Amino acid sequence: GSFATSIQVDPEEFTNDRKTLIGILRSELQPEGPTPLWNAANVAIRELVPQDGRKVVLLFTDGVDSPGNFKTNNLSVMDVMDRATKEDVMIYAIGLESRLPYGRRQAPLGGGGLTGGFGGQGGGGMTQRPDPGLPKIAAETGGGYFELTRADDLRSTFGRVADELHQQYALGFAPTKLDGKTHDLEVKLKVKGMKARARKSYLAAKAPTS
């Protein structure tokens, strides 16, 4: 799907047809307009929930969250993070630095989190980093975050994400507390110098009532 002035889900059914997906990306990406980032991520989760198997959202943007037509019902990164955790959805995020003309700096909702400077590739303008919520939601859900400064790096980054998804391990355990609450989770490796990338919390089931 794509998002800007509106959020579009296309194709209507999930597909692994590479030609179809590339055609959609070329014809429907919306380079101008607002960036309802977290509303779009929420729609992606909603579409994935009924599907069988592992659920992964790949979120790519060159902007910060700006609701546009969704101002009256705008979701925050925390809203989407909570839902992703509850629905067991992993989120990978790719953020691309963008260049804005002088005087048109876009501020993220809630203030803060935006850095930038002048100059760089492509001539004058202001360099804006991607939304600061991207690395947070990726870390919380066990996904990865990649921040790019050049669009030329997109192909290799998408390839890296695909490789990671094909080489993951699934770990499971039976929680001792069945209280229906969210609990912190940490996965550690015994191999020195290695670090696991895993979700930071889990939602325990409720104990059956007699």
Language-model regions, residue ranges each:
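Scaffold/interface architecture of coatomer-like assemblies
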Residues: 1-210
